[in-house]
Amino acid sequence: MKKLLILLAVAAVVFVGCAKDFSFDTVESKKDVIDSGVAPEDIAAWESEVDADFAKVMEALGTEDEASALAYFDAKYGTEMSKTGARYAAARAGSSGKKSGSSKYPAMTNMPFNKDGAVYISGGTDDMVGTVIDWVSPKTLPGSYYHGAVLDLDKYDPNNESVYCLETAITKGAGYETADDWRNKVNACVLNPAYSMTKSKLDSAQAYMDYYCDMNNKNMEYGFFKNTVNIFNVVTKADTYTWYCTKVVWWVYNKYGWDIDSNSSRIDWTTSGLYTIVKDYYAVRYFYSSKKKNQAIADYIATAKQNIVLAEEIVLSPYFNKVYENIRE
C-alpha cells in the first residue's frame, strides 16, 4: 500500500509536457504470463514493470495521452481500463462551466431554510463537477448524491436569497453558496440535526470554517483528490489546504464535536470508478495470488473510506434526519 501511494504521488507531479510514445508496434503482451497464474521467477522485477506502466497511466490521466496510455496498458496486460477511462473523459467533458448542481429544472421553492446547521446534499449529472464525482464515488442511494453544504442561519436573508449563507466548497476551495444556488440543484435533500444543539458551540464551529470559506481567502485549492485528476491521491480530512464540499461540512461538525462520517456498510464501493482502476491494477500486479490481490484492494479501499467523506455517508449518518428531498433524475 505504501509503495503504491509513493508511486502515485510521484506520477501525479507531471500532467503536462510533450506527448508520450505509446507504440502498439512494440508492446510486449503479458497476457500469457497472467493467464498462466504462475508467479514470475523474479517477482520484484514484475512488480517494478507493472508499477512503471501504471505510473504512465496516472501521468496521462486528464491529458491528451490518456486514451493511448489506457489502451497500451490494456493491450499489454489484458485489462479493460479504457472503458473506465472513457467514462471519466465523458464526465469531464459533460456540461463544462456550470455551477455545481445547476440545472434546467424549476427552482425548488419549497426547500426549507429554517434550521441552523442544517446540511444540504445534492446530486445529479447535469454539470461537470457532478459527473466527475458521480463517476468516482460509489452510487448506492437514489439521487446520485455527491455535493454538500451546511447552513449558517445567521447569514440567511429570506428577503435576499442571493447572499452567501451555506458553507461548502467552490472552485477556489472552501467557500459559500446561496439559498438561490441550492433551490436550483438537480437532486437535493435537507438533513436537520437529530439532536438538540448548543448555539454557541455551533456558532464557534461555523466561525472557524468561515476563515476558510471567506470568498477573499484564496490560499487553498479545490479538490476531491490532490492534483484533481489523480484519483488515487485522496485528500485527508486533516488537510486544511485542499477542500471539497462534504469535507467542509464534516469540518463544521467535527469542530462541534460530532463525527458525521458514518462509513456506512450500506455503501457499495465496488460501484465506483476508483475501485475499478485500483482493482485492475492489483489484478495485474498480483495475478498469481488472489489472496494478495484481494488484500491489497481491501487495504486501499479501507484507506479511502477513512479519508473520504462522501455525501452518502453524511445522508446515512445517525446524527441527521432527512426533512426534505426532491429527486428529478
Residue ranges and their predicted role:
Residues 1-4:
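Positively charged n-region of N-terminal signal peptides that target proteins for export
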Residues 25, 33, 42-43, 50, ...:
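Activation targets extended, charge/polar-rich intrinsically disordered C-terminal tails
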